[in-house]
Amino acid sequence: MQHEIVIVLDFGGQYNQLIARRVRECGVYCEIWPYDTPLEKIISKNPKGIIFTGGPSSVYEPNAPMIDKELFEKGIPILGICYGNQLIAHIMGGKVSRALFREYGKTHIKYDISSPLFSGIPEHSVCWMSHTDFVEKLPEGFKALASTENCSIAAFGDDTRKIYGVQFHPEVVHTEYGQKIIENFLFNICNCHGDWKTSSFIEEKVNEIKDIVGNQKVVCALSGGVDSSVAAVLVHKAIGKNLYCIFVDHGLLRKGEAEEVVSVFKDKFDMNVIKVDAKDRFLEALKGVTDPEEKRKIIGREFIRVFEEEAEKLGDIKFLVQGTIYPDVVESGVGKAATIKSHHNVGGLPEKIKFKQIIEPLRDLFKDEVRRVGIELGIPEKIVKRQPFPGPGLAIRIIGEVTEEKLDILREVDWIFRKEIEQSGLDNEIWQYFAVLTNMKSVGVMGDERTYDYTVALRAVTSIDGMTADWAKIPYEILERVSNEIVNSVKKVNRVVYDITSKPPATIEWE
């Protein structure tokens, strides 16, 4: 089935993926393409509309990103945001100037609510501005549609040509009614129908995978994370027992995690899950290593070797499943590519294994869409809504050398912290929460005896997307319960500290 599509042309703005997500949330499929995509390719997709993103450039800079003026003559509805707004005005014959006062942050705005772009929203509202340049004079045929105190043309449009520009950012949550403005563009102006549904995506992918794979075997590296789990279940729905999932237990997972992964996919979905106990191998390779980057490299190398050994035992397998998602595609600069593409070998895998093709069933989806697909496929919420967990696992939540004793300590501490957060009902309010075993020991007193044991750190943050984060204001009584249980039930720990550093300057993980 060919979905209606809206194309987001990327001019280097920080919110390009957010714009695409907002469009998808309206049930309209969209893709992010480079601004210099040839006009013929854009036209060939027959888009219902085009959105120009913001960007750091000024239209008057020598190498400022531009667009073919002919695009405006094709009858395709266009919405320019921030730089995209200035670009439309500049190319169409208006004037863009440098503002005396830079507008940044929340700003009061007045809309012309007779415009189809602002239909159904209050005349006075709040928007999010982030600009230095502004449209001073409109091109012929355009009308001002909004204004702020410092920007007399905060939006403009031509209803006949269906070309519009907004100086503010409707895609960010700080703009009141921003989503409604995007909906108006999609449904009032582009005449979209909203045919992008999770259920139709699953059906289409299942049929596509069946056609490509046929009766051949497929292998998948299953980590228990959201992306690999959803990809595996989706492919299994298509080809059943011809899918072989290799789950490498490197001994660096949280308490009960390995058993849970095997139980869910083997018992609930009746999938071929090959569990490889490689704990001793990984610990031996990590012996004496304290540098976090070196830990990552060693774990990655050993994982590849173990996966390779197990995959070879399965015989001639031509297909590998990867949990690539759309942000990976966009950030790699690859742009749109086929869902299933030919490769000589997998990025990161040695050339000892040569897969004919990689199956990436989720490469068109954002993370929130992946979660929705997972829920529709029947994957338990505890896996679908799992918090971000680093590939190297607990190895980078142990500061210094990784040993079996330290892993046992951290598993118990982390389990106590996570259990208390969940029982307190805070798990849906906190973006991520976990424990870190520091390499610091301190003096304590327990049972009238002197102790000299480890200090553990608790880390909990609130965030929207993980790019920035604030430390979570967990009530003192909950922290007190966690601390008491840890020092009373976990041997070799006598001190608990709480990390109250935001990101930036700190990162969420310690290593």
Swiss-Prot record:
Sequence ranges assigned to domain Glutamine amidotransferase type-1 in this UniProt record: 5-195
Catalytic activity: XMP + L-glutamine + ATP + H2O = GMP + L-glutamate + AMP + diphosphate + 2 H(+)
Record pathway: Purine metabolism; GMP biosynthesis; GMP from XMP (L-Gln route): step 1/1
Cellular component per GO, a single term: cytosol
Keyword terms, alphabetized: ATP-binding, Glutamine amidotransferase, GMP biosynthesis, Ligase, Nucleotide-binding, Purine biosynthesis
Amino-acid positions noted as binding ATP in the UniProt annotation, renumbered to this chain: 223-229
The EC number(s) this enzyme carries: 6.3.5.2
Keyword rRNA-binding listed: no
InterPro entries in the cross-refs: Class_I_gatase-like, GATASE, GMP_synth_C, GMP_synth_GATase, GMP_synthase, GMPS_ATP_PPase_dom, NAD/GMP_synthase, Rossmann-like_a/b/a_fold
GMPS ATP-PPase domain segment(s): 196-386
An example molecular function term from Gene Ontology annotations: GMP synthase activity
Biological function: Catalyzes the synthesis of GMP from XMP.
Subunit structure: Homodimer.
Protein name: GMP synthase [glutamine-hydrolyzing]
Organism of origin: Caldicellulosiruptor bescii (strain ATCC BAA-1888 / DSM 6725 / KCTC 15123 / Z-1320)
